[in-house]
Every structure is written in C-alpha cells, then in structure tokens.
Amino acid sequence: MPKRTDLKTILIIGAGPIVIGQACEFDYSGAQACKALRDEGYRVVLVNSNPATIMTDPNMADAVYIEPINWQTVEKIIAKEKPDALLPTMGGQTALNCALDLADHGVLEKYNVELIGAKREAIRMAEDRELFRVAMGEIGLDCPRAEVAHTLEEALDIQTRVGYPTIIRPSFTLGGSGGGIAYNREELIDIVGRGLELSPTTEVLVEESVLGWKEFEMEVVRDTADNCIIVCAIENLDPMGVHTGDSITVAPAQTLTDKEYQRLRDASIAVLRKIGVDTGGSNVQFGISPTTGRVVVIEMNPRVSRSSALASKATGFPIAKVAAKLAVGYTLDELKNEITGGLTPASFEPSIDYVVTKIPRFAFEKFPQADARLTTQMKSVGEVMAMGRTFQESLQKALRGLETGKIGLDPTGLDLGSEDDMAALKRELKAPGPERLFYVGDAFRAGMSVADVYALSFIDPWFLDQIEELISLEQQLADDGMAALDAPRLRLLKRAGFSDARLAELIGTNEEAVRTLRRALKVRPVYKRVDSCAAEFATSTAYLYSTYEDECEALPSNRDKIMILGGGPNRIGQGIEFDYCCVHAALALRDDGFETIMVNCNPETVSTDYDTSDRLYFEPLTLEDVLEIVELEQPKGVIVQYGGQTPLKLARALEANGVPVIGTSPDSIDLAEDRERFQQLVDKLGLKQPPNRIARNADEALVLAREIGYPLVVRPSYVLGGRAMEIVYGESDLARYVRDAVKVSNDSPVLLDRFLDNAVEVDVDIIADKDGNVLIGGVMEHIEEAGVHSGDSSCSLPPYSLSAETQAELRRQVVMLAEGLNVVGLMNTQFAVQVNDAGDDIVYLLEVNPRASRTVPFVSKATGMPLAKIAARCMAGKTLAEQGATKEIVPDYYSVKEAIFPFAKFQGVDPILGPEMRSTGEVMGVGRSFGAAFARAQEAGGIKAPPLGKAFVSVRDPDKQRVLPVAQALVERGFTLVATRGTGAWLQQHGLSCEIVNKVAEGRPHIVDSIKNGEIVYIVNTTEGRAAISDSFSIRREALQHRVTYSTTVAGAKALVHSLEFRGTGPVWSLQELHKELEA
C-alpha cells in the first residue's frame, strides 16, 4: 500500500559515538533514512550525540539534536518536537535500547508516539535470549542448547548440562560485549561475572559450544504485505567462535549446496515472520555442523546492522533507504531500484557476478596488554572490503587495502625449518588471532596439506584450497624469476589478485619495474559496474571495481573532474571524522559543477555510498590502484588532504607520477612533517617550540636527552594518532624506549621534545585560499593537560579559561604559519600555553598538520561553518571572499567535545591517558556555560555522575597544590575524602579532613579492596613515571570494572566536579536554533 499520510513528524535515534561493535555503518544507515523520509515529505527530527557524523549535519533533518541518547533527554525532545512516530532501527543497539526504555517508562504512550520499523514485542523477542530460543522452538528451528542465568550459581548449574567449552552471551549488549568462551570453571566465573555486570537486564545465556562450525548470515528485507527478499547471503571464512564482526566474510556464500541455501533462505524468512519484523531489514545468523549438517539459528538483529551496511555495498541494494520507506507503509514492489535507474522494482532480489571479501582491521598495537585472541566479543575497530571476479582476487585486494603494511599473503617471518616456530605456527592456526590468514599461508609454504590445516583451523577446505593455490603460484614465480613474466602469465597472476608490489618482492625487483613491464605488455585492469542484477539490465550508476578481463564498463566522461581519496579502513587515530570531510568535499564540488570521483575501500562509510559522488571506485588506496584510475579518468585535480594519513602517504609518489595534487603542495606537507625543515621555518617566523632534538641511534638519544632535561616526549617521525609515543621521566625509561621502539621507524630517527608540565593545550583549525587569505574556523582549549593526545582530550569551543590576549597571540601565529607553509585548504595547529614564573602566558608551537584534522566536524557543528566544504572550494580555486566566508564565528554558547574509549572491551589494559591515542569516537555537549556544556558531554559519553559518598584522591607531588580546590569543592558538595598517606597528609595540613587508606603495595585492606566493596564513588588519581603508573594500575582497572567514575588528570577532575550541579538540567536546543542565533 502507498505511504501513510497520518504521520507528519518522524523521530530517528542515531547510534551515538563510535565504539567497537558500532561504527560508522550507522551514520550511513541513518543518513540514508533521513534522506529517504524527507524525500517522501515527512518532517524528520534526529537525535545523535556524535558530531562527527553526516546525519547530524543541519541540512540532513528538519531538527537535529546533538544531545545524549538516554530516555530522559529524548523525552525532552519528544515533548518539544511532538513527533508522531519513532524509527528506532537505524541507530544500532543504542537506539533499540533507548526506544525500549522510552516505551517502558511510558514516554511513548504519554506523548502518543508510535514505534515504526520494529514493534516493541519484536525487539524484545529478538534481543531477549530466552524469548528468542522459545520462539525458534515453536517454529521448529534448532538453536544451540542453552539456558538463561541471572546469577553465577545458576550459570554454574547450567554449565553441567551443556559441557565445556561453554559460550556466554549477555542480553542487550553490543558487539558481544561481556561475552566469551570458557574452557574451565575459573574462566566461566570470570566471564559470567563480567557479563552480568554489563547486561542491562543482568542476564546471560549459557550455551553449548558450536566452535568450528561454519557460520552464515542472511540479510533479509520484509514488508507489510509479507513480501520477503534475501538481499545477500554472507559466509564467514572464520568458523563459529569468532564474532562475525571480527571474521573475514565473503559474499555471496561460496560453499553452500543449492539445497542448503534454500534451507537457510526458508528458515530466515520464517524467523522474520515469527519475530514480527514486518517493515525493514534484519540479519539472521546460522551455524552449520560440517560433520552432521545440523543447522542452528545463532541470533537475529531486528534492525539495520554492520552486516546490512556490508550487504548494501556488496550488492548496490540500499537496505537502510528501503527499510525507512517500508516503515512508513510502502511495499517492496512499489519501490524502484535506483541503481538500475528504476528499471527493476525493489522486490527484485539482487544477484551478483563478482565476489566480495571483507577483512576486519584491528588495533592491538595500541593495547599491548590486551588479549589478541578472537572470541565471541568483538575487538576489531574497522574493516575493508574488496571486489573481484574470483575469491582469490577479492581476497588479495582486501589484504592490500587493510594498510597494515601487508601487500598480499606476506610470510609471517617465522623460520619454517625450526621446530619451535612450527609449534608456534600450529598454535596460531588453532587459536584465531588477527593474523591467522598469514599463518595459513605459511602453513602451505611449510608443506602442510589442506587436511592438516583444516584439522587445526576448521576453515572450510574450499577456502584453504584457494589459498594453497595462491601460495603455489607465488612459489613457482619465485623459482622462475622475472624473465618468465610474459603477458599470459602476468595476466593470470593479476587475475588472482597479486599486487605489483608483491610480484616485485617475489622476483627480487621493485614495484616500478613491474609496473613498467606490465604496461609494456599491455596488461591493464578494466572496471566493471555494481548493478545488483549481474549485468541483466544496463545501469546508469557509476559504481565500479577493477578486474583483469577484456571489456571495460567505466565509460569515463570528458567533464571537469576532481578525485577525492578516502581514508580506507577505520582505525584508532583515523576514523569517521576524515570520512566526514571527504563526503563534504564531494558534495560541495558536485554543487560547483565538477564531476566528483571517490576512491575508497571502507564499506561502513557514507563516502562509499553510490550517490555521494558522481563516480565511486571501490578500490584499495595503494599507489598502483590509484594510478590506474587516474590514468583512465584524467581528473583535473586530486585531493589527498582529507582522508587522514592514508592518501597523504601517497602524495609524493602521486606527484612524481604526474598526478595533479590540488590544495597544499606535497612539498609543504613534507615541510610540516620533516622536523629539521620545519625547525628552520619556525626560527624564521620567530616562533617558540619546546626544546627538542633528533636522535638517530640509542646512544645519541641518551646524550641529547641530558641537554634538554627530563621529562621528555619521545616519538618516531611521521605517525598518526601518536603511535609509539611516550612520556619518559628518566634515563632508564628512555633506554628501554629506544631499545623497544626504534624498530618502529623505517630508517627514520626518533624525536625528543621537552615535555611541558601543567601546560594548557590548544587546537586551532583554519582555512587558507590561493591568495593567502586565512579564515579561523575555531580555537579549542583542551581540558586535559598537554601530554594527553589531542584526540583523547576533551576540548571546549570557545576557550573557557584563556585570556583574550593569549587567544589573539594564537591567532596571529596561526596566520603566519599558514602563509609560511603556503597552505591552500585546511590546516590544524596545536599549541601549548604555559605560565612562566612572572605569571605570563608563554605560547609554544607543538605541531602543524596541513590537512583536515579530526576536529573539523566538531568545529563545523559548533560554529555552523561547513569548514570541509569551504576548504574544498578553496582547493578547487575559489577564494574565501567569493564564498562569503571571511570572518571567524565565535558562539556565545559553549560546545564541549569528549572522547570515548574502548577500555571495557580489553581486559588488562590500563585506562590512563597519555600521548598515544586510544579513543575510538567522540560526543558533543552544548550549554550556556562551560560547566553546563561539559556536563552534557559527560552525560552523552555515558560517564555517570558520582552519587554522594567517599571520593578517593591520590595525586603525584607536582599536582598536590592544584588538587586542593578540587578536594575543597568535593567536600562542599557533601562528599567525604579518602586519600593515600602522602596526599592525605597534604590535605589535612590544609584543613581538609580525610580518611587514610593503604596503597596496594602497603598491605590490606587497601584502596582496591574498598573499590571492590563498593565503598568508593569517585576517584582522582594522577601518576608519573612507569613504576608509579604500574603500581596504581589496579585502581583504575577496578574502577572501570565496577563502573566507578574516575579522572586521571587534575584538570579533568576539576571540570567534572564543577559540572556536577548542571547534570540532567537545562533545555534541549537543535543545531538549527543554535545556528540561527549566530546569524543574528
């Protein structure tokens, strides 16, 4: 039936900050839903706390609220905006849980708001493990044997019936949070305890093991008329036991017989009917026993998910857009498939004539203490997808798109002749880790058979055969050498997905030599279109992937084109903020009449949506792949400064190959990154940097360190997200760092900087045009002291404590730097402001990045200035004056950005903040005062306000003076103080009464016992030096485990304590209302 006319306003809840298990795929689905519903004439209200999303742009919905996603705040928005319906299926687990809370607290009933897209009962039945199991039994589908436990005793009792290994899955959590696999009683007690604490309903499912079974997912869409289509069948290369978000997955499914496929198809449709999902997309996961063929249903998600984003990109069928329209009453046969230009209806099941492989990207290098074994709890931070005509081609393209330094199935570096290394290899095959695929390659190099590898890994023999064949192709080529490379052989190897770089490695030459030979032999890729119908109908949509065949379907135009290189897979330090900038560049330049070409390989993002740009190449971001596209399309300009470090690393090589890089020149980018050249510029401009030196070997480092004095910040040059950066407090620390970390630098030296203690860090984003005019986008004052990575620090716009004179000085310096570097486009600068003995502010320049930075979306939302769009137009040749963007906007309200961390996912990782970036996402809070804005941001970040009770204070000596006002404020608020001996004596001397408690090393009962007993409600704990950090580690870890609010910097504690009075108060404002104030 046609769309409903009784609904006028629809509220969409977004997914909040990016966390492990819930990344930018929900920005993609939410943005699509907003577009789809507004196209149908509905008024759309959106709430999402994450400013780095496209969906929170003011033009995406009629009212956009960047507010905390909890039922109390959403109730205020409902009261104000009076929506008729709430669509909760676009914002992942966060939105579903919030919708259930609103229903349970009677808010939906009170304001007469209807849930569309998924009914309350359907969400309940799908999410509640016990209800789901019963429902499956009623329709004759098998689930793994399991029972629900609400206490540890119940869990131990159930275990006796299901046996070890036991799988534990908490209800209503995201990405398998708190779950795991227990092989013995001790592990069971640990995992169940954690699971019960993380589950909002305090229940866990204790389930029989189906480890080693094959895992499949079906993406299903169903409408009110009971039309059902399977958009895509996805097969996990990794067997059951690895969370599907951490598995390598392949579409379409490769190893199902036709009969098995029909069985899964019928079963998944039966599941949707039983659960009652009648308008939209769901994903159903199955396990199949490789020995008996028994099929079990693992779970279903009654919403758009990570897998549906993958299925949408893999097939070209926009699941979220279709699901949004079904939610307002359309049926599938009434909707047109856009990718075929409307030639087919949406009820036409997609069929694909290529293979898609997704490989997850991990960040264990950021969390050395974490357990890198993959289990049922998701640990990856991003993913990459590749398409090819065969599984081998798409697998190898995906491997080089991961950007982990691999260029194919690279050897792991094990000595395959040694017994110890072979034993290690077998362990790696058995216990899955992030590198398992490379160990599979090594197993075949060592002469193991497919049967041997299967017995250890349970990866289906079909996949193992494919990988074995790739290894034998490698070995033959290495034996034959370059002379044997004629056109037929090279074409065969390229069809199997080998990169030029990997071929060069195998025959002992360089990538350029292989490229020259390949071009001479006329072995070039062609581009095929993704059309959702296996080329049955012509498609007008230019959504392309490369392969080595005969017919090219690219058909490039001769319009003026600009190509934007995306950021590749999400990782810590390079996330959705960079994708946001790429999307803005594409939208702005398209409006200006350019044909826009996007190159990217991340399936979760808005940039890889086929209608964000005019042409989309879904390709790895390597020099080889980019050069081939440039050659075919001949763009007027290529933008490399928007995708983070990924495209920047290619800038020099692209320029050397004659590619027109627009914006800031690769030479200026290099000048800003090269320490010695940059030092000269700073001296010439008369600016100050912290005293620094460059050391090229270990001994030199120790000598130079004495010249500067400790503490020092040490790091390798050319890194993003502060990789391998550390603060060292003495010689033994530095010696250890130089011994362990210099391996990081590729023939590049280590940088030593004097660490500025107790300085305030400031970020400034600016745009410069080709005439050298500069627009200041925003000045942000960090809340945590210098020394915490800027991506991990909270910040405030406008600054909340810096004097007007200091701010003017910062602006003056930034303008000089932009001119000195000849910046065209965006530039981000970081300063530290330190008070000298005379009480004056001294400004030190920390670093300059002549590219888009991760603060661009936040600044754009806070000031209403679309910085990435303005800068893209500057790069394409427009001036700031022509765009009417010449004056800085300083709002009279405060916006605070707060970072979100994944520490709860990684047992054993210390949650202390430092110079290495470890946050995965961000939230934003707005208020009339700094305290109010900070309180909103804390609430949005899920950081709970400590209830009255005992506050524990333990700080390093230099912080004792500064912690006094914080301690006083706590006492005035009604908290009682608890402190360790040193800090306690200091507080008592200054007239504050406090209870003294033992440090862990001083014997029991000590502070950690108090935390475990629930006696402590808030913790302020600062430390310096490695020894003190590791002594106090258990305090921070237990705080995290027992959900006690804690601060690891004095400035953070001060802001938190002063913001307590604002918690939960104040009205809600939409961005549209805030930005209107700025125009006045």
From Swiss-Prot:
Top-level taxonomic group: Bacteria
Domain MGS-like: 943-1080
MF terms in GO: ATP binding; carbamoyl-phosphate synthase (ammonia) activity; carbamoyl-phosphate synthase (glutamine-hydrolyzing) activity; metal ion binding
InterPro entries on file: aa-tRNA-synth_II, ATP-grasp, CarbamoylP_synth_lsu, CarbamoylP_synth_lsu_oligo, CarbamoylP_synth_lsu_oligo_sf, CbamoylP_synth_lsu-like_ATP-bd, CbamoylP_synth_lsu_CPSase_dom, MGS-like_dom
Binding site for Mn(2+) 1: Q285, E299
Residue span of region Carboxyphosphate synthetic domain: 1-403
Binding-site residues, Mg(2+) 4: E847, N849
UniProt binding sites for Mg(2+) 3: Q830, E847
Coiled coil: none
Region of interest (Allosteric domain), ranges: 943-1080
Keyword presence, Magnesium: yes
Residues that bind ATP 2: R715, R754, L756, E761, G787, V788, H789, S790, Q830, E847
Pfam family, one: MGS
Cofactor(s) this protein cannot do without: Mg(2+); Mn(2+)
Stored SUPFAM superfamilies: Carbamoyl phosphate synthetase, large subunit connection domain (SSF48108), Glutathione synthetase ATP-binding domain-like (SSF56059), Methylglyoxal synthase-like (SSF52335), PreATP-grasp domain (SSF52440)
Binding site for ATP 1: R129, R169, G175, G176, E208, V210, E215, G241, V242, H243, Q285, E299
Chain sites annotated for binding Mn(2+) 4: E847, N849
Free-text remark on how the cofactor is bound: Binds 4 Mg(2+) or Mn(2+) ions per subunit.
Domain notes: The large subunit is composed of 2 ATP-grasp domains that are involved in binding the 2 ATP molecules needed for carbamoyl phosphate synthesis. The N-terminal ATP-grasp domain (referred to as the carboxyphosphate synthetic component) catalyzes the ATP-dependent phosphorylation of hydrogencarbonate to carboxyphosphate and the subsequent nucleophilic attack by ammonia to form a carbamate intermediate.
The protein's name: Carbamoyl phosphate synthase large chain
